[in-house]
Amino acid sequence: MAIGPKPESIIGSYDHPPQAEAQTEVKSAAINGDTSPVSRLKDFATDPWLTSTDQPQPDSTTNVPYSLPDSTQDARILIVGAGYGGLLFAVRLLQSGFTLEDILLVDSAGGFGGTWYWNRYPGLMCDIESYIYMPLLEETKNIPSQKYVSGEELRTHAERIAEKWKLGARTLFRTTVSDLTWDDNKMQWIATASFSSNEKKQGSCTYTINADFAILANGTLSKPKVPDLPGIDDYTGRIFHTARWDYDYTGGSPAIPAMDRLRTKKVGVIGTGSTAVQVIPQLARWAGELTVFQRTPGAVGLQENRETDHAWWRDNVQLAGPEWQRKRCENFNAFITNPYRASLEEEDLVKDGWTKHPSFSVALGGARNLQADFLDLAKKIDKERREIGQQHINSTVRNPATAEALFNPTYGWCKRPCFHQGYFETYNRENVRLVSTPGQGITKFTINGIMWGDKEFELDLIVLATGYDLGSLCPANRARLSIHGRGGLSMSQKWASGPATLHGVMTRGFPNLFFPGTSQAGVTANQSYMFDRAAEHIAYIIQNARPRTAASAVNLKVLVEPSLEAEELWAMETVSRARAFAATKTCSAGSYTISARLGESVDESQMARHMPWGEGMASYVKILEEWRKKGDMDGLEVVYD
């Protein structure tokens, strides 16, 4: 049983959001191949972007394999995931002194990019400024074409990183790790992996990977989630998820999404979150009729995109000097987590909807979140945000009833905000209609389309913009694999009473395993920055755990894990700051927050252990930097064999 402050003192309680609507909990199904409970969704688990067969491609950064894996693979460091996170871990390890041969990346996709590999729907773009989101811009000398670039450019950048550091030769694509088990005798992680040479042909093999260290760099936006509602198997039209877009049906391509085959089609979209906000305007341009089914309106702010001016880039970005990207990231973090904007002496470099939305620090944590007047100020700023948003909708959308339905009156920290240039204008088109189902969602699928209440909507195509299966907050469940540490203890068992970690990246009983996430760690809206700081920290730990004595000791096995005292102390430091997120308790079940994801079944003391670092990302990063500067690996036990 976890030890901590009395429950009522941990997180606290606040009033409910303005005009908050009760949401009906809609069961959902993760798309996971043959395990999907919905039979017609099983083909959603296949990779629609595979363009090659089984021919070796030794020089390619996508659609590898260069060869079928042997029955056993050996690696010093196994990285699960080859998106931006996995790439950052690989690069920071190389920069810390490891060799390419020390590293092995695996990913279920057929190429680099993670979420940017799987998602190629029309309208896909970054909603965080490209100059801070696209990692390693300094090292690759890449200049993004726009302030917010397309998904195609984001995926190409992942391939650029892989090519620069020659990571293609040390990556196994189409490879899914299902189990990680610690072998105390070998002092290694034994990974069970399955390799699908061509999912469309169902060619596959199973093998093991023996690794001294393992890093879970799986992203959260790659496993599609769909509503598990009656009738979905009865529907006779075409249906797919935005993360598995079918251009053969719609026409067009990821590069040129001219969906001319939809000219005469009746199209329905379920969802109005971040993905839907991007795809709906594109579908409206091409579909004969477009019906949008909305359960809860998104909080959509204006995104002012523009081409990158190279003279501006030279004068305002490059002249900022070494580490300009990190400085810009941290400037962004400062403005989105501090509603006391007058206290910030520096200039807002990013100047977008995010930095004008500092009340989101209620969900992220921040230096001022524990101050007595913080919540009152956050509410005041958020009220101004809602009023500006409502004015924009009312002045843009011509139909008053539609405008009212599109307005989200709840606090801006309950859901991740959306940003777009032209979303609300879409609802002025004659071929677009909004079906608002306040807090309920659709009733069921039918043979011909969708039923809401007693009205049926006939549709040729249903697009599921229903988000992604985030998994639970347990690292094993989040990575969708089974993890057993010392003595056969499962990660899920250890997490059941609330996590205990050192710095949010390691836990005792699971040596040499690293799992960057949100619990007991700093968070920000820019996930690339979070991965980069975790990669920097973990590379330091692994490098400094290696023996530095005689050359004969180089091949010694190393075991590194937190002490029981150190991880409990870090957990209590997190708990003591958990009330920074008190206002998130008022958010509904379908919200973005950790409180909503954990649900009412988790008591306050456990919930507090799951929270991020309450003082915000800057405080968290400073603590890690000071810990590394000391150089004594405080709180870690290191054993050689």
UniProtKB/Swiss-Prot annotation:
Gene Ontology MF, one: monooxygenase activity
Residues that, per the record, bind FAD: T115, W116, Y117, W118, D127, I128, Y133
Cofactor(s) needed for function: FAD
Composition skew (Polar residues), residue ranges: 49-68
Superkingdom of origin organism: Eukaryota
Positions bound to NADP(+): M125, C126, D127, T272, G273, S274, T275, A276, V277, Q278, R295, T296
Keyword GTP-binding: no
Gene Ontology biological process terms in this record: terpenoid biosynthetic process
Catalytic activity: protoaustinoid A + AH2 + O2 = berkeleyone A + A + H2O
InterPro entries referenced in this protein's UniProt entry, alphabetically: FAD-binding_Monooxygenases (IPR050775), FAD/NAD-bd_sf (IPR036188), FAD/NAD-binding_dom (IPR023753)
Co-factor binding comment: Binds 1 FAD per subunit.
Pathway listed: Secondary metabolite biosynthesis; terpenoid biosynthesis
Site positions for Transition state stabilizer: R416
Alphabetical list of Pfam families matching this protein: Pyr_redox_2
Presence of keyword Oxidoreductase: yes
Keywords for the protein's UniProt record, in alphabetical order: FAD, Flavoprotein, Monooxygenase, NADP, Oxidoreductase
Other facts noted in the record for this chain: In A.calidoustus, the austinoid gene cluster lies on a contiguous DNA region, while clusters from E.nidulans and P.brasilianum are split in their respective genomes. Genetic rearrangements provoked variability among the clusters and E.nidulans produces the least number of austionoid derivatives with the end products austinol and dehydroaustinol, while P.brasilianum can produce until acetoxydehydroaustin, and A.calidoustus produces the highest number of identified derivatives.
Membership in a protein family: Belongs to the FAD-binding monooxygenase family.
Protein task: FAD-binding monooxygenase; part of the gene cluster A that mediates the biosynthesis of the fungal meroterpenoid acetoxydehydroaustin. The first step of the pathway is the synthesis of 3,5-dimethylorsellinic acid by the polyketide synthase ausA. 3,5-dimethylorsellinic acid is then prenylated by the polyprenyl transferase ausN. Further epoxidation by the FAD-dependent monooxygenase ausM and cyclization by the probable terpene cyclase ausL lead to the formation of protoaustinoid A.
Name of the protein in question: FAD-binding monooxygenase ausB
